[in-house]
Regions:
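Alpha-helical substrate-recognition element adjacent to the catalytic core
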Residues: 1-23
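Conserved strand-loop elements at the edges of beta-sheets that form or border functional pockets
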Residues: 8, 115, 187
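Short, structured coil segments at secondary-structure junctions
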Residues: 2, 10, 107-109, 163-164, ...
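Mg2+-dependent phosphoryl-transfer enzymes with acidic/Ser/Thr/Gly-rich catalytic loops
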Residues: 122-202
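A short acidic, helix-capping loop that chelates divalent metal ions and anchors anionic groups
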Residues: 7, 14-15, 120-122, 177
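Conserved acidic, metal-coordinating active-site core of Asp-based
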Residues: 27, 31-34, 38-151
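Beta->alpha turn/N-cap motifs
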Residues: 1, 44, 170-171
């Protein structure tokens, strides 16, 4: 959830969670519906909820998270019954930029809106990113950011890479992410994270 939720991997307990205001779902869906081929996704613990036009990028998100897509007729009613850490808007990059411009104009004062990839537009509570939540986690266990190594490849990883004592970009990372990193490792397909562990943690 890009920093909106911290879960204890041993117990499954949610340590920290921040949610979107429910009243943003309807106006966001209105924006999405203006553009053919654009989808909006919400997340449960087991599935992705689709309110727009399911596309190849929604399928990509489904594959990445090992979660099926469930298409619902009334997206707003469905998602406002639950707490939502984030929405993801997916589609062709040029259309995503148009959606982004509209969303920023309407919600800039209380949402965080950015592209994690050219085809993924993240809609988050304001002030939330991976660095924010990792800093909270470090504080809870008595460590500083100097002790943290972060690996990433997308725009949504920038803040944590810049905050970490050692910020690492994958070889397949976006150019700006590479520019911001202290170290560039091998690609995801070449076990780049394992390379970092072997290089810096043994």
């Amino acid at each position: 959830y890009n920093g909106c939720r911290i879960t204890d991997c041993r117990s499954g307990e949610i340590i920290y969670s921040k949610y979107l205001p429910n009243d943003v779902a309807a106006p966001l869906l209105e924006i999405v519906k203006k553009y053919p081929g654009i989808d909006i996704l919400a997340y449960t613990d087991t599935e992705l909820i689709s309110g727009g036009d399911t596309n190849e990028y929604s399928e990509k998100e489904s594959f990445i998270n090992h979660m099926p897509i469930t298409k619902v007729d009334d997206f707003v009613s469905y998602v406002t019954k639950n707490n939502n850490n984030k929405f993801l808007i997916t589609g062709e990059p040029e259309l995503i930029q148009e959606v982004k411009a509209e969303a920023e104009k309407q919600f800039h004062s209380y949402l965080s809106i950015y592209c994690s990839d050219p085809f993924f537009l993240e809609i988050m509570p304001q002030g939330i990113d991976k660095a924010h939540s990792l800093t909270k986690l470090l504080t809870s266990i008595g460590l500083s950011t100097d002790a943290m190594i972060c690996c990433g490849d997308g725009y949504n990883d920038l803040a944590m890479i810049e905050t970490a004592g050692l910020g690492v970009a994958m070889e397949n990372a976006q150019p700006l992410v590479k520019e911001s990193a202290d170290y560039i490792t091998k690609s995801n397909d070449e076990d780049g994270v394992l390379h970092v562990i072997n290089e810096f943690m043994r």
